[in-house]
């Protein structure tokens, strides 16, 4: 009888836990995805803060030339970064227990791999948690779909690109200047500026910013005034009110006359879908571009594509970009190799004929 009571009590505790996890009445929804999201993001955040402050230099290129990234080793907020895991480790799974000592783990950049893998798992669970909460509330799933764009972008630079290049040392450093360095080296090695998917991503991000500013300014300019001239127009809105807060007909008429009639939306739902879809699709394409360039399917190469009647090259902007790429490639990892990879790959002529 005692055993039966204990089993019922344990089932009751489990049931209460399940109800609490999935309850939409909590101040912050947890959900089953949140059970995994919370510890992974806490781990990634904690290790990032500690490593950014105090991690020792990391042998990123695997040539016994450590690079300092933490504040206590001479960096500031701008120059500081979590240095990627050493090229000597490559793509190996490198937890603390795989190293001979903590010092070795730190020297080989173990914190980077720990942070990145926990972070990617955490943000993927955050996306799942968005879907889960939408499902519980009877909402459509588009919030999670929109969030999939930055998740895909992060996965591309932190996981797919290192896999394609063969080492976590090629991943994006976790810092401001490290991000810029990653971008410059990426351009040098893959000519990303000439890749159509990157162009679509630029159109998505800048276009999304433009459309957001246009929409916000149109709405703000066509508010239905509920207050006097001496009060803020914002005071005329009450949370949950059924009435429209702005005159979409006026906004539609203004924009239609400013550009042309069919440039303006007359359906609020299709308008907001467009505002969400434009940047999301653009960032999806950017992530896809990074993922293809990870395996060296690079941007277009129009070098020396224009010649005169004598066969002399007429330089185009593509040739200027190529010259800049060579300069950037020469300068990065300058002690790891003597020549840019594309120059070193040229077949050497035979001396003996």
Swiss-Prot record:
It holds the Pfam family Photo_RC. Signal peptide: none annotated. It is a multi-pass membrane protein. Tyr-161 forms a radical intermediate that is referred to as redox-active TyrZ, YZ or Y-Z. It is found in: Plastid, Chloroplast thylakoid membrane. PROSITE patterns: REACTION_CENTER. Chlorophyll a PD1 binds at residue 198. 2 of the reaction center chlorophylls (ChlD1 and ChlD2) are entirely coordinated by water. Herbicides such as atrazine, BNT, diuron or ioxynil bind in the Q(B) binding site and block subsequent electron transfer. This is Photosystem II protein D1. It comes from Cucumis sativus (Cucumber).
């Amino acid at each position: 009888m005692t055993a039966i009571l204990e089993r019922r009590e344990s089932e009751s505790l489990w049931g209460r836990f399940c109800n609490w996890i999935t309850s939409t009445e909590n101040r912050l929804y947890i959900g089953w995805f949140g059970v995994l999201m919370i510890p992974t993001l806490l781990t990634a955040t904690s290790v990032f803060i500690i490593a950014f402050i105090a991690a020792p230099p990391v042998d990123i290129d695997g040539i016994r030339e450590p690079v300092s990234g933490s504040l206590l080793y001479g960096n500031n907020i701008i120059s500081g970064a979590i240095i990627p895991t050493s090229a000597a480790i490559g793509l190996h799974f490198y937890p603390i227990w795989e190293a001979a000592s903590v010092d070795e783990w730190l020297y080989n950049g173990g914190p980077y791999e720990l942070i990145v893998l926990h972070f990617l798992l955490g943000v993927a669970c955050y996306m799942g948690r968005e879907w889960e909460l939408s499902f519980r509330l009877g909402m459509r799933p588009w919030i999670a779909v929109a969030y999939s764009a930055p998740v895909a972008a992060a996965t591309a630079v932190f996981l797919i690109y290192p896999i394609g290049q063969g080492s976590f040392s090629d991943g994006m450093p976790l810092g401001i200047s490290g991000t810029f360095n990653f971008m410059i080296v990426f351009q040098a090695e893959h000519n990303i500026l000439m890749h159509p998917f990157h162009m679509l991503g630029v159109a998505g991000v800048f276009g999304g910013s433009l459309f957001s500013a246009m929409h916000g300014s149109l709405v703000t300019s066509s508010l239905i005034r509920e207050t006097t001239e001496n009060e803020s127009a914002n005071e005329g809105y009450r949370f949950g009110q059924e009435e429209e807060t702005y005159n979409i007909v006026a906004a539609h008429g203004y924009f239609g006359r400013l550009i042309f009639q069919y440039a303006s939306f007359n359906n609020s739902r299709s308008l907001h879908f467009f505002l969400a879809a434009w940047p999301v699709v653009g960032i999806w394409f950017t992530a896809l571009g990074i993922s293809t360039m990870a395996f060296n399917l690079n941007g277009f190469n129009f070098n020396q594509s224009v010649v005169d009647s004598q066969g002399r090259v007429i330089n185009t902007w593509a040739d200027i970009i190529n010259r800049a790429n060579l300069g950037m490639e020469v300068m990065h990892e300058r002690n790891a190799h003597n020549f840019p990879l594309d120059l070193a790959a040229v077949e050497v002529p035979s001396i003996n004929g």
